[in-house]
Amino acid sequence: MHFSFVTLFPNIIEGYFSDSILKRAIDDGKISIDFYNPRDLTTDKHNRVDAPMIGGGAGMLMTPQPLMDTLSKIKEESPEAHIVFLSPVAKPFIQNDAKRLVKKEHIVFVSGRYEGIDERVIERHADELFSIGDFILTGGELASMVLCDAVARNVEGVLGNSVSLEVESFEASLLEAPSFTKPINYENNEVVSEFLKGNHSKITDLKRGLALCKTKFFRPDLYKKKV
């Protein structure tokens, strides 16, 4: 699977893929990444990629020409590319989106800067828009990395243990049950005894019960949908 990042600051993103699971996935050929900097295609004589908002408003917007030309270039090179814009006004990205997007061959993440992107770019090129929450970041790079990580870990072979994907939070519309490791007793706080008895059927039932309790406490919105 291939991921492209359209960003004015590729170094911010590049470092994230230089270690750990996603680096191994790249080395093993499970995923690949590349970068497109709109500044490379700007026709502005001063190499600018931003301008004041028409009609007034604080701050600057990314101008349409560099982004339009960059995205058109990507679509010419890769007609199947699925272009995703990151915006706080968009719908929240959820786990089901990650599982759906992993079926795409090529995803392009467009990272905004300044006060955002000229709306005409979004209207022409966006296949989807996503938000990672009701808050504002200084740029879209972090959000792009979040989405890429969430999608990439669903690519077959990226995680060493595929079972991990089946028992994670949100996979059954519930939060994941509490997990424990050694020591069994730590500072007079013991692991639930049922986990130690080896009865896998009872452990499964216990985990589901704990997952329901955890979801009800931390995410009552999910709990209401489940029950």
UniProtKB/Swiss-Prot annotation:
Identify the EC number(s). 2.1.1.228
**Sections of the chain in a coiled coil:** none
Q: Origin, by domain of life? A: Bacteria
- What keywords were assigned to this record? Cytoplasm, Methyltransferase, S-adenosyl-L-methionine, Transferase, tRNA processing
The entry lists its GO molecular-function terms as: tRNA (guanine(37)-N1)-methyltransferase activity
Provide the protein name.
tRNA (guanine-N(1)-)-methyltransferase
Asked if the Swiss-Prot or TrEMBL record annotates the protein with the keyword S-adenosyl-L-methionine, the reply is yes
Please write the reaction equations for the catalytic activity of this protein. guanosine(37) in tRNA + S-adenosyl-L-methionine = N(1)-methylguanosine(37) in tRNA + S-adenosyl-L-homocysteine + H(+)
The principal localisation class reads cytoplasm
- List the record's Gene Ontology CC terms alphabetically: cytosol
Q: Give the enzyme's main class according to its UniProt record, as a single word.
A: transferase
What is known about its subunit structure? Homodimer.
Q: Which family does it belong to?
A: Belongs to the RNA methyltransferase TrmD family.
User: What GO biological process terms are annotated to this protein in UniProt?
Assistant: tRNA N1-guanine methylation
Q: Which SUPFAM superfamilies match?
A: alpha/beta knot
Q: Which residues bind S-adenosyl-L-methionine?
A: 112, 132-137
Localization annotation: Cytoplasm
Its biological purpose = Specifically methylates guanosine-37 in various tRNAs.
